[in-house]
Amino acid sequence: MFGKILTKLFGSRNDRTLKSLGKTVTKINALEDEYEKLTDEELKAKTTAFRGRLESGETLDDVMSEAFAVVREASKRVFEMRHFDVQMLGGMVLDSNRIAEMRTGEGKTLTATLPAYLNGLTGKGVHVITVNDYLARRDAENNRPLFEFLGLSVGINVAGLGQQEKKAAYDADITYGTNNEFGFDYLRDNMAFSPQERVQRPLHYALIDEVDSILIDEARTPLIISGAAEDSSELYTKINTLIPHLVRQDKEDTEEEIGDGDYSIDEKAKQVHMTERGQEKVEVLLTERGMLAEGDSLYSAANISLLHHVNAALRAHTLFEKDVDYIVQDNEVIIVDEHTGRTMPGRRWSEGLHQAVEAKEGVHIQNENQTLASITFQNFFRQYEKLAGMTGTADTEAFEFQHIYGLDTVVIPTNRPMVRKDHADLVYLTPDEKYAAIIEDIRGCRERGQPVLVGTVSIEQSELLARLMKQEKIPHEVLNAKFHEREADIVAQAGRTGAVTIATNMAGRGTDIVLGGNWAMEIEVLTNPTDEQKAKIKTDWQVRHDEVVAAGGLHILGTERHESRRIDNQLRGRSGRQGDAGSSRFYLSMEDSLMRIFASDRVSSMMKKLGMEKGEAIEHPWVSRAIENAQRKVEARNFDIRKQLLEFDDVANDQRQVVYAQRNELMDAESIQDTIVNIQADVVNGLVDQYIPQQSVEELWDVPGLQTRLEQEYGLKMPVQEWLDKEDDLHEETLRERIVDTWVKSYQAKEEMVGEQVLRQFEKAVMLQTLDGLWKEHLAAMDHLRQGIHLRGYAQKNPKQEYKRESFELFQQMLETLKHDVISVLSKVQVQAQSDVEEMEERRRQEDAKIQRDYQHASAEAIVGAEEAESLSAHTPVVREGEKVGRNDPCPCGSGRKYKQCHGKLT
């Protein structure tokens, strides 16, 4: 109450922010008359002048007003489009590490040109990030004339480009591309073998379009570059035949009784669990097929792989549905993005799930994968020096943007008032009643000439509605993952008189639905259109536009509530753009997923109290409130999962940053001789300590063991016992010096034989290859650790602390192994000439070329399990990296040790 009074008196935080920025808009507007009088050459020269001022010490804030005014004037000349004042506000928000919420149709693409130009002046690179290749190409080509007019270069980074093409794209002032491609290029750069193979520059400024989709929806799906592991397709096929024999539990276990069945499904958590009865049945079936020894348990250590395959097959059959979660196309299982409804070719589920789905569908089973490199979008984007984003729906997730990324959200007012009518939800008892009402509503809209966009949550639902409309002889277009090639065309014409378009979820997002149809696209398809043809198309469009406005504008019809309010708002936001007329309504049934899982009891009791009968709908604020509360529950749960994923990945991220920094230092260094000398000393001292402990008597020395180890692992034949027998004054310290000295002389002899330059190159190649191999094994070990770590909660231990401690121990072991392996290879291998080094590098490149780079969307289920054992801890706010860590500074991983004794050991 008190807060509301303060807001009335002083305005909300958003109002105060906009008021402050409004002063700068006034300055920009004051420059408009002056810049209108400039010639094209004088306007273009402003770019050179701005760059000169920045080089002399001025900041971007100092030149912002003038730069924005220049972009506005250039846009008027190139596009015949003038930036509105609200777009100027949006541009300033985007330049200040914040998120701008701008409604659909308010010109986000044009708004982005302002901060992109301003930050492009620095020459450090601007990355404008979109959700798919089509939008990246479209926005780059649309805005290229403006940026090139002002002297800035534009690059496009999409899948399928060669190394040189990618490098050219990244060297441009402004680079458009998809989030996946930027992330994978970062990982690929950190798998490179020479500086010339890297394509990215340091990450400077990222401007993310549809920021909620990328930073929220995709946050649970880490990017993984993987290579094919062993072939186990036959095992997946055999295990797949077991699942039809299992029966779902008819009721959940309670204290009084045990449900009758082999497995139970937790729909809220999207998990499946085998019951004791199910485990016994699977063991019998496996034994019958000769896959399990008589009397052996599925849960014994030797059968963990079998258990993994059974669980994957069970999940594939019970939790993943064809035409909802994936489609089968060209003998391949292709994932459907649950948030956008688009297919994701090349993406694969991890942990054997994709192979299990392939076995279920009877298509070719591809090999399992081994992780070579991975990162979450959260940790990738937090590496940018500046980060900003824009979307039509960010306010509902404002807390998460601030909490995880440190980004405030500013709601930008619309240029014209919003007049769309959002009707209350209609709730029916059954889906049949709901679909009958939807068809009736569509028929009414068609009679009025009002276009309709029908939003569905799955391909299956969109095809069901399409069949119903066909039966009713209602002309319609279907836009889902199966027909994404025609996406832009279908969306562009969805605003024509009486048009009916069925769209899966938010497929088609990023393309405006223009009332009366998109006249610009009609002109585009013509070859050299005359002015008369263009004028006729525009005249015809104006007639259609007026008819549609008179009929009520675009009507949005939702067939089910999504588990996120934001996705529902995105669907509604397709109507009412730039002050257009429009309306929206959601039709629900008690059997919808959200209603069944979260809201059924409360709403059912309300319906009974109101005496509902078949075919009747309920429309009441109580129902809308109950549904919204259900959505809040799901949003809170999903936020917790994303937060946990980040907390776990932060541990791996510290290690990732250290390894990648070391790789880059190794690649950039002309010589790593000093590093090799330091490692050599560490290895020798550690080895001698094992067999001849410091300050110990000779009786405790294991000289034969030391000699054997030196010869077997390092190829060094040292007569240590002979030295001791002949020289009475040889004690532990002088013996250590003798061994080191002999080792160094042996290595120097190798250097004299092959030449210093060849050996320096060979050292670098060995160090990189060994580090890459061990890092790959370390990632696999971390995956295994994470998958079972939640069980520590049942032993009254904190899973996150245990994960942090054990992963640090694994990392320490990896560093020690790296030292020993590198010195072992350098000591034993005989390098004959430069050609040996080149052959080694070529072999590495050939192996790299064979890697099947499956870009996986990994599941976060192992992390979700930690919820059962541990309550969520408070999350540490994100702090962007500052200066380089000194060797004597505390290690950033939080171990309490000095950096040089912890993650800095390699340096």
From Swiss-Prot:
Disulfide bonds: none annotated. One of its GO terms (biological process) is protein import. It catalyses: ATP + H2O + cellular proteinSide 1 = ADP + phosphate + cellular proteinSide 2. ATP binds at residues 87, 105-109, 512. Pfam families: P-loop_SecA, SEC-C, SecA_DEAD, SecA_PP_bind, SecA_SW. Residues 878-887 have a biased composition (Basic and acidic residues). PROSITE patterns: SECA, SECA_MOTOR_DEAD. It is found in: Cell inner membrane; Cytoplasm. Gene3D superfamilies: Helical scaffold and wing domains of SecA (1.10.3060.10), P-loop containing nucleotide triphosphate hydrolases (3.40.50.300), SecA, preprotein cross-linking domain (3.90.1440.10). GO terms for cellular component: cell envelope Sec protein transport complex; cytosol; plasma membrane. Belongs to the SecA family. This is Protein translocase subunit SecA. It comes from Shewanella sediminis (strain HAW-EB3).
